[in-house]
């Protein structure tokens, strides 16, 4: 007996594949049209894949982005890396940030539940990310600022504004530090930490399940608004340079190895401690711009991310760095 007697019709395989992939018909509709069961339709479609009658192609740059993300995940031991494609139509100076922010918003809403406590940091990428949250997907989670306010930046980018907007978009309760993030002395920080509102929030930090932050770059060139907007004095900045600063996250400054810079800014800052931050189960970093590559690498070496969301140009630069 010829073995071919057990083979399905090639025509039927092609027809089922055509109806399914080209015409978008359901397996039930195809079964009715071809006079076979849904199970047979499923097998015909599988045969079309096995015999390479149908071929799946992921177009560039999407395939390259997927492969780059996989490499970054392996190199830095990340739970997930998402590389956002930059749309080529209607390009603007914020296209990279917006692409990263949109992916960040969708990722956050994919994982957040009403049992979560979400810590939020300041920044322009965070501004767009929260802007893109879908208010139809309300979670009733808890939202908390990861640090104090920054008087020298745009009101819309401040952590207090962003945390309030996130709570309004997704539903839930917000907890905020209402004082400035950088204070004049360590004594003022100690006094604030004794106040009930501040003490309650600092205690809440140990219960945060998800954090959402960007990073700022201070190497090879300082582009972070914490430097360019006079957040700190020139003397403070020079101390950071002498401490080999590479970047900032949640008002904390870190070096090439992701360790916090040892200057008096550390004790004058009202923000979650880096050690406490690193214990958060899901740390999401959303970063855009190739100028942040060195700072981002330092943050990843310092284990500051579980999930990384970046634009395709920054991803390519990160892969090229040793």
Would you name each region that the model predicts?
Residues 82-85, 145, 176-178, 285:
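Structural signal for conserved beta-strand scaffold positions within catalytic alpha/beta enzyme cores
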Residues 4-11, 15-17, 22-29, 35, ...:
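Conserved phosphate- and dinucleotide-binding cores of soluble alpha/beta proteins
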Residues 117, 126, 165-166:
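A generic, well-ordered mixed alpha/beta core segment in the N-terminal half of proteins
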Residues 4, 46-117, 131-139, 152-155:
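HTH-adjacent hinge/linker in prokaryotic transcriptional regulators
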Residues 16, 100-108, 129, 201, ...:
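Generic hydrophobic alpha-helical segments
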Residues 42-44:
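Key DNA-contacting residues within the recognition helix of helix-turn-helix
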Residues 121-125, 312:
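Glycine-rich beta-strand-to-loop/alpha-helix junction loops that act as flexible
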Residues 142-150:
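Catalytic or ion-translocation cores adjacent to nucleophile or general acid/base/metal-coordination motifs
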């Amino acid at each position: 007996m010829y073995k071919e007697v057990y083979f399905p019709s090639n025509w039927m395989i092609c027809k089922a594949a055509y109806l399914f992939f080209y015409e978008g018909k359901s397996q039930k509709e195809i079964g009715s049209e071809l006079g076979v069961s849904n199970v047979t339709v499923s097998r015909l479609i599988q045969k079309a894949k096995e015999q390479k009658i149908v071929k799946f192609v992921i177009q560039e740059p999407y395939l390259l982005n997927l492969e780059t993300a996989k490499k970054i995940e392996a190199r830095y031991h990340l739970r997930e890396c998402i590389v956002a494609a930059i749309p080529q139509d209607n390009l603007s100076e914020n296209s990279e940030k917006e692409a990263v922010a949109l992916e960040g918003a969708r990722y956050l809403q994919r994982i957040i539940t009403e049992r979560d406590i979400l810590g939020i940091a300041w920044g322009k990428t965070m501004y767009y990310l929260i802007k893109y949250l879908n208010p139809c997907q309300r979670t009733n989670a808890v939202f908390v600022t990861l640090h104090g306010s920054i008087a020298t930046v745009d009101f819309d980018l401040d952590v207090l504004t962003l945390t309030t907007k996130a709570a309004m978009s997704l539903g839930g309760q917000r907890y905020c530090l209402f004082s400035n993030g950088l204070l004049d002395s360590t004594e003022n920080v100690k006094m604030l930490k004794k106040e009930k509102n501040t003490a309650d929030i600092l205690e809440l930090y140990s219960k945060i399940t998800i954090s959402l932050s960007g990073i700022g770059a201070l190497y090879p060139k300082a582009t972070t608004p914490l430097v360019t907007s006079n957040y700190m004095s020139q003397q403070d900045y020079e101390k950071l340079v002498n401490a080999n600063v590479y970047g900032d996250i949640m008002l904390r400054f870190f070096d090439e190895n992701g360790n916090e810079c040892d200057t008096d800014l550390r004790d004058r800052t009202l923000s979650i401690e880096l050690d406490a931050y690193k214990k958060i189960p899901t740390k999401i970093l959303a970063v855009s711009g190739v100028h942040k590559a060195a700072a981002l690498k330092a943050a990843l070496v310092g284990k500051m991310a579980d999930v990384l969301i970046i634009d395709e140009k920054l991803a390519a630069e990160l892969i090229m760095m040793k």
